[in-house]
Amino acid sequence: MSREVMEYDVVIVGGGPSGLSTAIKLKQLNPDINVCLLEKASEIGAHILSGNVFETRALDELFPNWKELNAPIKTKVNKEKFIFLGKSKFLSWPTWLLPKVQHNKNN
């Protein structure tokens, strides 16, 4: 029985934020390296864009020109709210009680 074989220098399991940024950085450091990124979703990043608040610092570091590349990040945050979700109830938390790292700024 014969099987098709594909050889890679690096295989990354999971196309989430960590796996995707690892693959990107590896290719930036060495464009000749063969990288395989395995993802269970129908396409890479399918589970990433979820309507969440996205801190763009990682994009700035990986792709300094990401805004010119027409990245699908268009909506700026105009209001902030922090809510704890329980099984049957929720609790709104005043944003002034949150640490600075939890505040959205310039996104």
Q: Language-model segments: what does each one mean?
A:
Residues 89-94:
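Short acidic/His/Gly/Ser-rich catalytic and metal-binding motifs that mark active-site loops
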Residues 29, 40-87:
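N-terminal FAD cofactor-binding segment of flavoenzymes
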Residues 96-98:
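A short glycine/small-residue-enriched secondary-structure motif
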Residues 100-107:
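Short beta-strand to alpha-helix junction loop
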Residues 5-36:
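N-terminal Rossmann-like FAD-binding beta1-loop-alpha1 element of flavoenzymes
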